[in-house]
């Protein structure tokens, strides 16, 4: 290792813990910040995140603390792994301790509850002058700490940030690819949570492989259509942060959003499901935000509209599914159709 860095990871959830552990294994000085002092002390002593990643021993050199100043001061890299509803508040709190040259990376896959603001846009607003990046991809935290081979994407306008993150996280089991389409990478991570709910619901209702394949590919088409109108590169959605994350999240019960959909398909109430989940499922809030924005832009997103009708308008799942099958039959691969 050429240079030993100080790195802060803000957020004691499963993904923040997994990323911090990789960095500690790579012999950097890393602090994992948890809001709860009790949880931080227990995790530091047990060398285990008993709440979100029970059963997995953390590296002995990983420092776990509830002292935000201690974690952030002097850090060259700061990863923010905070749910969207409290992301801005934590960034504002950390701002006073950031070094002027610190590079800040969001790992959150959501949209701020009020207004269509992505997490890296919050970083830009709250931390002017800092290099900003997004880390996203098909990355279940449990499989990362199990040292399953995993690929992720770091997206930024800054080549220096991209290079630094790649070097800091690279290991024999974790590979980081580069992308300059930060907006597209971040949208992919947020949008796929909606479709994970849909696919989980379909699985609970006994959907066959044909149905699952159709849902996945039409989900990808909707994501690309929406993102292109929002200014992202639709080709980004053919990579790890797009179709890769979509496949992972829509086919596994390790996904919180998939589990929400599965429970909905079993007839359970949304409020009960969210209360019993124990962790944040970003897809429910993202659905509200994307439905509103799609209506404003006039984007054709039948799957988003259908799920919204089920969750918030009291429509029956079978009624919505039947309507979707009788809807507009459009082109299959739209970004190819539109090329001159």
Curated annotation (Swiss-Prot):
Binding-site residues for NADPH, renumbered to this chain: 14-15, 35, 109, 141, 256, 280, 282
Keyword Oxidoreductase annotated: yes
Pathway: Membrane lipid metabolism; glycerophospholipid metabolism
Domain of life: Bacteria
Compartment annotation: Cytoplasm
Record-listed E.C. numbers: 1.1.1.94
InterPro entries, A to Z: 6-PGluconate_DH-like_C_sf, 6PGD_dom2, G3P_DH_NAD-dep, G3P_DH_NAD-dep_C, G3P_DH_NAD-dep_N, NAD(P)-bd_dom_sf
One of the GO biological process terms: glycerol-3-phosphate biosynthetic process
Residues binding sn-glycerol 3-phosphate: 109, 137, 192, 245, 255-257
Pfam families: NAD_Gly3P_dh_C, NAD_Gly3P_dh_N
Top EC class, one word: oxidoreductase
Cysteine disulfide partners in this protein: none
Record GO terms (molecular function): glycerol-3-phosphate dehydrogenase [NAD(P)+] activity; NAD binding
Gene3D superfamilies with a match to the protein in the record: N-(1-d-carboxylethyl)-l-norvaline Dehydrogenase, domain 2, NAD(P)-binding Rossmann-like Domain
List of catalytic residues: 192
Free-text function comment from the UniProt entry: Catalyzes the reduction of the glycolytic intermediate dihydroxyacetone phosphate (DHAP) to sn-glycerol 3-phosphate (G3P), the key precursor for phospholipid synthesis.
The protein's name: Glycerol-3-phosphate dehydrogenase [NAD(P)+]
Organism: Cellvibrio japonicus (strain Ueda107) (Pseudomonas fluorescens subsp. cellulosa)
Origin organism lineage: Bacteria, Pseudomonadati, Pseudomonadota, Gammaproteobacteria, Cellvibrionales
